[in-house]
Amino acid sequence: MMFPQSRHSGSSHLPQQLKFTTSDSCDRIKDEFQLLQAQYHSLKLECDKLASEKSEMQRHYVMYYEMSYGLNIEMHKQAEIVKRLNGICAQVLPYLSQEHQQQVLGAIERAKQVTAPELNSIIRQQLQAHQLSQLQALALPLTPLPVGLQPPSLPAVSAGTGLLSLSALGSQAHLSKEDKNGHDGDTHQEDDGEKSD
């Protein structure tokens, strides 16, 4: 009689233990699923961010490629112009007197020796002229741009020098206008003084 009772008691504890293990396993699976879901969400956000950065890089690449292609074409064009001008100089040179020939040859050699500071100065002047022409076309006042802000569609050689140059030009124009107004005021005062005499 004792054996069946012990057997019955053992069998009654087994479903409870099995039920507890199944519930625990389900909880673990649920926790792991939530963890994987969080990792998936994080990876998806990172993937979207990388895709956005990739499209931005591709856009910059296309822009720089077009700029590089345009500069390459312009360089070949300028090289061809220089070649033709050298040919014209070589044809005209024999018709000059010996003294003038030496002067022209010296001037040509000096023209070929362009230094980096001279190039930077030339590029800066061209950039200033281009910016001023754009500002005049847009009918905007000559005020310096905020630091770090570049005009659209302008290839900047140096952001700092371009902005400082534009700022300097704006202040010079403003000062010259004030000087002119002050001079006109002095002229009117002198005229009034003469009339009073």
Curated annotation (Swiss-Prot):
UniProt GO MF annotations: identical protein binding; transcription corepressor activity
Region (CCN domain): 166-197
Domain of life: Eukaryota
Gene Ontology CC: nucleus
Modified residues (Phosphoserine): 196
Keyword vocabulary terms for this entry: Nucleus, Phosphoprotein, Repressor, Transcription, Transcription regulation, Ubl conjugation, Wnt signaling pathway
Tissue expression summary: Found predominantly in muscle, heart and Placenta. In fetal tissues, abundantly expressed in the heart, lung, kidney, brain and liver.
Post-translational modifications reported in the UniProt record: Ubiquitinated by XIAP/BIRC4.
Cross-referenced InterPro entries: Groucho/TLE_N (IPR005617), Groucho_enhance (IPR009146)
Stretches with biased composition (Basic and acidic residues): 175-197
Keyword Transcription regulation: yes
Region (Disordered): 174-197
One GO BP: regulation of growth
UniProt keyword annotation of Phosphoprotein present: yes
Localization: Nucleus
Subunit annotation: Homooligomer and heterooligomer with other family members. Binds TCF7. Binds the NF-kappa-B subunit RELA. Interacts with PHF12. Interacts (via Q domain) with SIX3. Interacts with SIX6.
Similarity remark: Belongs to the WD repeat Groucho/TLE family.
Domain comment quoted from the record: Lacks the C-terminal WD repeats.
Function description: Transcriptional corepressor. Acts as a dominant repressor towards other family members. Inhibits NF-kappa-B-regulated gene expression. May be required for the initiation and maintenance of the differentiated state. Essential for the transcriptional repressor activity of SIX3 during retina and lens development.
UniProt-recorded name of the protein: TLE family member 5
Annotated source species: Homo sapiens
